[in-house]
Amino acid sequence: MINNEVSRKYSSALLEVALESDNLSRFKEELEGISKALKQYDDLKKILYHPRVLPDDKKEVIHQVFSDKVSEPVFNFLNLIVDKRREVYLDFIIRDFIKQANRKEGLVKIEVVSAIELSEKQREQLKNKLKKALNKKIELKTKIDPGIIGGIIIKIGDRLIDGSIKHQLDSIKESIEKIPVTELGVIQNES
């Protein structure tokens, strides 16, 4: 619960700065880069999140890693997070900022899972249909999972649309298993 409160407070403040300075897309891109760096470089995350590493040392690491990669407001924001001892919430803050920024931009991130790779044409058709249905800008991410056999699974936020053959087969199997044996006309061996 405190994660949500802290992340919302800081992400909302940064969002306000981004909107006032007309830098929403830039801030979002920079924060996505920071998030990627934290995931990619475990040592960076360990230093920033460790409670015994002094704030000045953390700020020096931030300077070395990000000073030439992010704008001054985002750089200052990172230092503020360290000054306020909120580094452990950085992932949550970034995630919340990106969600709020996407909402402001009318952007929806959608993940599509298919058994085989979708062609560029199929991706574009799907993207256009989703764009029309949702009346939003779409950012489409595709994944391949041969285990779904065929069809596609679409994940939109918390919603899941499962049009996979595996799901359909599982549904059929479940329906068949619910039918009492006597209704199937199967004669049971009486021993």
Curated annotation (Swiss-Prot):
Cysteine pairings via disulfide bonds: none
Keyword Transport: yes
Cellular compartment(s): Cell inner membrane
Pfam families: OSCP
Protein family according to the UniProt entry: Belongs to the ATPase delta chain family.
Free-text function comment from the UniProt entry: F(1)F(0) ATP synthase produces ATP from ADP in the presence of a proton or sodium gradient. F-type ATPases consist of two structural domains, F(1) containing the extramembraneous catalytic core and F(0) containing the membrane proton channel, linked together by a central stalk and a peripheral stalk. During catalysis, ATP synthesis in the catalytic domain of F(1) is coupled via a rotary mechanism of the central stalk subunits to proton translocation.
Name of the protein in its database record: ATP synthase subunit delta
